[in-house]
Amino acid sequence: MMQFTSSYFRQVLLALCVAFALSSCVISRENVIVLERQGSFTAGGTVISTPGTFDSIADGAFSPADQSTAGQTLHGDHAFVFYQIPVDARPLPLVFWHGYGQSMKTWQTTPDGREGFQNIFLRQRYPVYLLDQPRRGQAGRSTEPTTISAATNDQLWFGIFRLGVGSELYPGVQFSPEPAALDQFYRQMTPDTGPLNIELNTKAVSALFDTIGPGILVTHSHSGGMGWLTALKNDNIMAIASYEPGSGFVFPEGEVPEPIPYVRGALRASAVSLEEFRRLTEIPIVIYYGDNIPNQPVENPGQDQWRASLTMAKAWRDVVNRRGGDVTLVHLPEVGLTGNTHFPMSDLNNLAVAELLSNWLKEKGLD
């Protein structure tokens, strides 16, 4: 009779484990994202210094409350950039810029745990660059101080992002009703660590494009207006896709429209020279707005401010296109996508939203 030793059984068990692991890899390989490289860097920024001489003995510890800053520097006001380059990458990367109160998280995993635009477009072989603008998120070191509030304002964000009213979701909204998803949404809000400085932000993102070369800028909300200004600075921006730009529309001098009033405010545009403005006519631009935006003034400020933004965006599109530009404005309900919030890239139907962008990139020869 054949005798089986404990060593033999260990070898059999090991072989079975290896075989199982390999078979699992084969089964799931179609879901794997294969990267050529990934990493992070900073772009732009400033350096300030304090006069004097640094004493590494007397001032070389963090503990003293009265520690001197004499002779020391502070590197801050840069953008923080995380990038991933897939194997067999397309030539033009997508650079994703978040909105107000947000960070690069808005492009990553959705509040309900699905893949965001980061992975969706990696799977389509686009290099992706995700940034935290100066004085936000991982780019938090500011050269100017500020006070960070601990105000209880979750429900304000709930309304501004058009999830619903108060704590009630809009009927048919493309946001998960699961409490855990709402919890994740609230926890992605990100404060500024210094005063908001639009010029500083646009310089940093322009420096990013100086570093990586030609690419496509994808903005959201507050970064929409800063995106136009960055394109005026940098010819490496080959196109812009903007999700619900909320402010910062620039018009040629003499063609700035009247402010558009909304509940508790008014949306104002600004002027640039016609020579500067022409730059915006040289690149294709697409703008997307979601659902639950009224056509007429309403009392709900979470809706009414986006009515003003959509109205201004239409006027801006018309001015750019009259001067030979190529701006497409897509109101998602009009193309069959209903229920979208202020951040369609994180909605339940974000795959369909991404497909619209993919098709536009292909149509414009940017793929």
Predicted segment positions?
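N-terminal cap/lid segment of alpha/beta-hydrolase-fold proteins
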Residues: 27-89
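Conserved alpha/beta-hydrolase
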Residues: 114-140
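Short beta-strand element of the alpha/beta-hydrolase
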Residues: 91-99
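Conserved acidic catalytic loop of the alpha/beta-hydrolase fold
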Residues: 195-216
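Active-site glycine-rich loops that stabilize anionic/oxyanionic intermediates
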Residues: 98-110
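Catalytic active-site module of serine/aspartate enzymes centered on a nucleophile-bearing elbow/loop
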Residues: 339, 343-367
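Gly/Ala-rich beta-loop-alpha elbow adjacent to hydrolase catalytic centers
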Residues: 218-227
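The feature captures the conserved acid-bearing segment of alpha/beta-hydrolase catalytic domains
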Residues: 247-324, 328-330
